[in-house]
Amino acid sequence: QNQLLRQFATGNFKNLVKTMNYDPAMLEWLDNNQNYFINDGTFTFNENYARELLELFTMGEGNYSQFDIEEATRSLTGISSDGLMHSIFSPIRHDFGNKTILEVTDDIGVDNLIDLIFERQEPALFLSRKLYQWFVYKIPDEIIVEQMANIMVIHNYEIEPVLRALFASEHFYDINFRGSKYKSPVWFTLNTKHKLYIDISNNMDYILWYNYLLGQSLFYPPD
C-alpha cells in the first residue's frame, strides 16, 4: 500500500481511489473481506469500507446519507483479498441488483460507484481542502480551496497541476503563514541528519526508536 500511495502521490486522484478499492491491505483493514452477497438471498454486509470511502477518502462528512452508505456497501460486495498480496473479485458474492446512491438508481458496481462519486464537486473540494491544510495552514481559505478544486476538475482530477498552481501562488508565500507548519518526527529527525551530514546507515534502530518516542512509528497506522 505504501508503494501504491507513492505511485499516485501527484497522479490522478480518481484512479487512486479506484485502485484502492482493490488494495489487499485496504480490504483487510476496513473489513470488506466480510462484505458479500449470496445469490440465495442471504448476505453478510459490512459498511466499514463504504463509510470510510465516502467520509474520509472522497466526500467528507455531511455530504452523503446513511442510506448512501448502505447502498454503496452493496456495490462493494464480492471484493476480498487472499491475505495482503492479491485482491479477488467474486461475481457470485456480488450484489448485481439496482442501488440508489447519491440520488442515482442503477446497477452500480465497484468502478461505477467511483465514477458516480466523482461526478460531484465534493471530491475535488475535499482533497483540495486537505492539500491546503497540509501545505499552507490548518484553517483553510475556502476561496483558495475552491480555486484549487476548479483546477482539479479541469485537469480530470490530476493532483500535480493543483500543487503547481498552489506553490506558484502569492497566497502560498503570504508572510502570515510562515512558521505555521510543524515537521513530523520523521521529517525532523531525517532532516537533521541531512543538514548535519550524519551517517546513520548502521544506526537506523536509533532513528526508529527516537521517532517512536516522539510519537510516530513508521508503517503503524495512522503513521
Where would I find each of the regions flagged by the language model?
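His/Asp/Glu-rich metal/cofactor-coordinating catalytic motifs and the adjacent surface-exposed loops
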Residues: N2, R6-D223
